[in-house]
Amino acid sequence: MASETEVKIRAAVTKALNTSAAFNRKLKNPFRRHMFLTGIHEPMAEELSLDHLEVSGEIPETLVGTYARIGPNPYKPDPRGHHWFVGDGMVHGIRLAEGSAEWYHNRYIKSGTLERNGGPPAAGGPRRGSRDTVNTNVLKLAGKTLALVESGPFPFELDRNLDTIASVSYTHLTLPTT
């Protein structure tokens, strides 16, 4: 449970960020494209499943497993008020086995926030607060693949194909889980 001081600080910071974003959204669109919505920061437009990837060179047969990374990928970004830390979580992964690249998948974390932004339906599970975007870290813990964020929402469990199963609560933890 957050302390009274923490609640007041979060409320003040949230109000300031929302006020700043609202101001930015009223500005006319700039002549140039938004720096965090182009180039290497440009959001992926869709989820992909690519199988039996072509490999240049060799992958050692002993290198087996899934490499996954996560980051913000706004579903419907507003270029007038976008910050690159803020964005729906998207996990990317590549599965290696027997000297081959079996697949590449990228998947949105099926949060309630993503659903409210017009994305696919949210996965089940407990929530802490109305904003449940996770977009900072992905790790394996006790046999589960978890997507996390440092700001407070519960982690989301992912299956072996990186699809969202549900949010997960470790009830004895009252602070962020990363």
Feature names for model-found ranges:
Residues M1-E47, D51:
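Intrinsically disordered, low-structural-confidence terminal and linker regions
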Residues G124-L141:
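Structural signature of eukaryotic scaffold interfaces centered on beta-propeller domains
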